[in-house]
Amino acid sequence: MISFSTCWNSGRHTAGEEMLREIKGEVGFGCVELGHGIRLSLMPGVQKMFDAGEITFSSLHNFCPLPVEVMQASPDVYQFSSAHERERERAVRQTLQTIDFAERLGAPFVILHCGEVRMNPITDELISLIKKGKLFAREYVRKKVKAVQKREASAPPYLARVKDSLKRIAEYASHKNVRLGIEGRRGYEEIPSERELPVLLDEINSPQLGYWHDFGHIQIKENLGFLDHEEWLRQIGQRAFGCHLQDCIWPAQDHQPPFSGSVELEKLVPLLPSNCLFVWEMSPRKTAEEIRRSVAQWQERFGA
C-alpha cells in the first residue's frame, strides 16, 4: 500500500480541503498521511474531506494536529525522554490526542519520535566533515568515537523515561485500534538508536508498538558509518509497520523522490513485510512532476 505525506504541502495551505485536493490532483494520491505540520486550523477541512469520502488516511505523524502554542512543524517540541516531568506529560497528552484523531479519521498508524540524549549534536558535525572530504579522517573518527562513548554512558535514564511513556501510550492505543510506529531517526543523538530499538520493543512487548523505517534517515546513518542499511533491515524489517519512502543524495540530502539518490530500493524493499505501508515523504521543494515520475517508476518495479 502506498500513501503520501502532507509534509510536502501543509506549510503552503490555510485550508485543509485545498491541501488534500492538491495532493489528489497534482500527485494522484487518494490515501494520505497527515504530517507533523498540521495546524489545528487545517483540521475542519480535513474532517470534511474524510466525512465526504473523498480521502482516506493511512497514518498521522505525532504531534497531529500541532499543539496550539506551536506555529510550525515541531515533532520534537515535547519529548518522552525529557528529564522534566511536565514536558513528558505534555508529550504524552499530545500523543494521546493524536491517537484520538487517528481513530476519528480511520487511520491505523501513528508515527512517533521519542526524544534524544542530551549531548553535543554530533550528526551535523560529522556531515560537515564529510562535505569537506574528511570521511574517516582522524578528526572524523575521533569525534565519532567520543560521541559513541558519551551516548552509551548517558543513555540509560533517557531510555527509561521513554519506555515508561511508551507503555502508557501503547495501552491507550490498544483501546483505539491504532498502532504506533517508532521512527528510525536521522540523528545519532536521538532515541532509540538501532542498537536500542529491538530491546525496547522486546521489553514493552506490545502488539501496538512496532518499527517505522525511514529510508532517508537510515541511509544518512549508513553514509556516516554508523550502520549498514541492508543489514539493519535484515534484522528489524519484519517488525516494521510501515516506512517513510524517500531517497537521499550523498551524504545527507534526504526527502528526495525515490530513484533520485543512492538508496538501493530494489534490494531493501523486499526486506520489509508484504503488507508494509510505504508513505512518500517529500521535501516541499520537489515538484509534482518529479514526484509523479518517481511514483511511475515505483509502480513499474514494485506494483501499486
Locate each region found by the language model.
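Histidine-acidic metal/acid-base catalytic patches
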Residues: 1-25, 40, 45, 51-56, ...
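Active-site acidic/histidine proton-transfer and metal-coordination neighborhood
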Residues: 80-210
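Short acidic/His/Gly/Ser-rich catalytic and metal-binding motifs that mark active-site loops
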Residues: 66-73, 119-122, 252
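Short, basic/glycine-rich phosphate-binding loops at helix/coil junctions
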Residues: 75, 140-146, 244-249
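Active-site loop/turn elements of alpha/beta-hydrolase fold enzymes
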Residues: 36, 62, 114-115, 185, ...
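Short glycine-enriched loops at secondary-structure junctions
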Residues: 7-11, 61-68, 115-117
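A short beta-strand-loop structural module common to alpha/beta enzyme folds
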Residues: 30-39
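Short hydrophobic interaction/assembly module
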Residues: 50-74
